[in-house]
Amino acid sequence: MSKTFLRPKVSSTKVTDWVDPSFDDFLECRDVSTITATSLGVNNSSHRRKNGPSTLESSRFPARKRGNLSSLEQIYGLENSKEYLSENEPWVDKYKPETQHELAVHKKKIEEVETWLKAQVLERQPKQGGSILLITGPPGCGKTTTIKILSKEHGIQVQEWINPVLPDFQKDDFKGMFNTESSFHMFPYQSQIAVFKEFLLRATKYNKLQMLGDDLRTDKKIILVEDLPNQFYRDSHTLHEVLRKYVRIGRCPLIFIISDSLSGDNNQRLLFPKEIQEECSISNISFNPVAPTIMMKFLNRIVTIEANKNGGKITVPDKTSLELLCQGCSGDIRSAINSLQFSSSKGENNLWPRKKGMSLKSDAVLSKSKQRKKPDRVFENQEVQAIGGKDVSLFLFRALGKILYCKRASLTELDSPRLPSHLSEYERDTLLVEPEEVVEMSHMPGDLFNLYLHQNYIDFFMEIDDIVRASEFLSFADILSGDWNTRSLLREYSTSIATRGVMHSNKARGYAHCQGGGSSFRPLHKPQWFLINKKYRENYLAAKALFPDFCLPALCLQTQLLPYLALLTIPMRNQAQISFIQDIGRLPLKRHFGRLKMEALTDREHGMIDPDSGDEAQLNGGHSAEESLGEPTQATALETWSLPLSQNSASELPASQPQPFSAQGDMEENIIIEDYESDGT
């Protein structure tokens, strides 16, 4: 064997005296005297572990030589450790903003947050309750940094909530849990919600502890919550109760920061619905992604400083590479700085993209003005991924806008291919976007995207013939996804037909120079299908509960039987049946039917799935396999059913008729009578 292999074995007897066994107290092995490693300074700095001898090698020398270091060696090691830390410190922490002027946030957003802090903290009334602020925005747009910098400049303390980790088990805890002499075993545990409530109570009641370097000359403070306990995502009602209580007893403002998610999980709508925001008077400030121009200035500043300081140790990127990096990070300046540091390190030159020659086909098809834009844009999307850019995602509002406005690139008259004369009506300019990629980047099911498209496409057309053609494409797409046997296979084709059909049918927007339908902004709305489908299910359950003797399907019951019962003069003893028949079987005496109230779609809202349809419901839009065949499922029990508000009101009945009562009580009464008759026989 080699000496290197035997060296650890020789010094192993020395090392055992430095180690304190973990279970010596539990096993009651106290015969061996041990020495703690911390008291003798075994935990050296990273510099001493790197440059000095190893623990096994140094154990062969006397302890006197190992402990006595000259002052020159100590100073040299301290300076080297500081230099090592400064070189390896992340640039995100190294160049973090310290003042308002260094923030990569729009000035109006900074003024909006500063105005709220002045009104709720600096100008706060003595007996004013707890005020709540909700800050939303994409990751890396400067939400938390803005709050901390403004609080520091105005002398406001910040008490931040951090999710606690489970405490480590100690020896005494281990003994108490597995004590053989006791029949009771206690596991020390406290839920995160209980800890969060206790934190809010203590933070609003007591001041922050003064640590070394803190200046606590003011009693003004705020509570900052960015990482909520995970239990609130499963049970949001618990958070709502905490917010209601804090508004009553809180003594300082409470700020929540939630990052927008493009994966479909809308935490803002789950944790802070509109009802809670109105009830608790929660202010809402929404941050935008960092603009590429502002991000470019910050990256140039970092590159200039690092190039002057470490000229030969980093690779200085050019302007084109920085522009690609800014576009690929989707407004996340934190991700941009991290990617810049990683790509600028020595030996990572191949990570910076280099443009290749464009195809001759694209040069011939596109005009000179568009020839420089579109190939660069397509190539940029491929290059940014090599630098480590984020996946480009779209909110629903922007995704619908790209389909409905359908911008196109103009073609040259000579080189562009032309259709035959008998097909000239189908000729269009080239689209600037791929509809399938737009739907994919929206992170929405294709059927749900078709619902939003069907709700909003009419306002973007000018000719009725184009609307008819677009509706045919939407109907054909709905047929493809109608059968549950083939829905999973044809879903992508259905979405492609719907999006491309709507874009192709709009002749007013068929060419790049056309301004069909005007270029003005048009609001988008949520589908009315959800409300109508919910009303249909309520009527279905009501009809099955009130008319069980007819044994008819829901479609026949509501289209063939109930309308005729409303015209007959047969008296009925059940007041609930009378109210339901008048609600379903008679149309209101109005000459002009008003449209249903439409709910506007905001620019940062995700696709809404009907909450009553269940998690397993897939959209043909939103129903399960059984519902797509014609009737809703019986998942909702009849015992939990109640009449809708419009059917349970007494204002729709004539004065001679008795007032309707709950159908559930009538069902219970019938059951009791049947049980009584069966006992008598």
UniProtKB/Swiss-Prot annotation:
An example molecular function term from Gene Ontology annotations: chromatin binding
Gene3D superfamilies: P-loop containing nucleotide triphosphate hydrolases
Residues annotated to bind ATP: G137, P138, P139, G140, C141, G142, K143, T144
Positions occupied by motif RAD1-binding motif: 17-25
Subcellular location: Nucleus; Chromosome
Post-translational modifications reported in the UniProt record: Phosphorylated. Phosphorylation on Ser-646 and Ser-656 is cell cycle-regulated, enhanced by genotoxic stress, and required for activation of checkpoint signaling. Phosphorylation is mediated by ATR upon UV or replication arrest, whereas it may be mediated both by ATR and ATM upon ionizing radiation. Phosphorylation on both sites is required for interaction with RAD1 but dispensable for interaction with RFC3 or RFC4. Phosphorylation at Thr-633 by ATM in response to DNA damage promotes interaction with NBN and recruitment of the MRN complex to DNA damage sites.
Residues carrying Phosphothreonine: T55, T633
GO process terms (BP): DNA damage checkpoint signaling; DNA repair; mitotic DNA replication checkpoint signaling; protein localization to site of double-strand break
Keywords for the protein's UniProt record, in alphabetical order: ATP-binding, Cell cycle, Chromosome, DNA damage, Nucleotide-binding, Nucleus, Phosphoprotein
Interaction with MCM7 as annotated region, ranges: 432-681
Residue numbers carrying Phosphoserine: S71, S86, S359, S646, S656
A Pfam family recorded for this sequence: Rad17
Entry GO terms, CC: nucleus; Rad17 RFC-like complex; site of double-strand break
Region (Disordered): 42-63, 606-681
Domain of life of the organism encoding this protein: Eukaryota
Residue stretches of biased makeup (Polar residues): 631-662
Acidic residues bias: start-end ranges: 666-681
Protein family (similarity comment): Belongs to the rad17/RAD24 family.
Quaternary organization: Part of a DNA-binding complex containing RFC2, RFC3, RFC4 and RFC5. Interacts with RAD1 and RAD9 within the 9-1-1 (RAD1-RAD9-HUS1) complex. Interacts with RAD9B, POLE, SNU13 and MCM7. DNA damage promotes interaction with ATR or ATM and disrupts interaction with the 9-1-1 (RAD1-RAD9-HUS1) complex. Interacts (when phosphorylated) with NBN; promoting recruitment of the MRN complex to DNA damage sites.
Its biological purpose: Essential for sustained cell growth, maintenance of chromosomal stability, and ATR-dependent checkpoint activation upon DNA damage. Has a weak ATPase activity required for binding to chromatin. Participates in the recruitment of the 9-1-1 (RAD1-RAD9-HUS1) complex and RHNO1 onto chromatin, and in CHEK1 activation. Involved in homologous recombination by mediating recruitment of the MRN complex to DNA damage sites. May also serve as a sensor of DNA replication progression.
Protein name, as recorded: Cell cycle checkpoint protein RAD17
Phylogenetic classification of the source organism: Eukaryota, Metazoa, Chordata, Craniata, Vertebrata
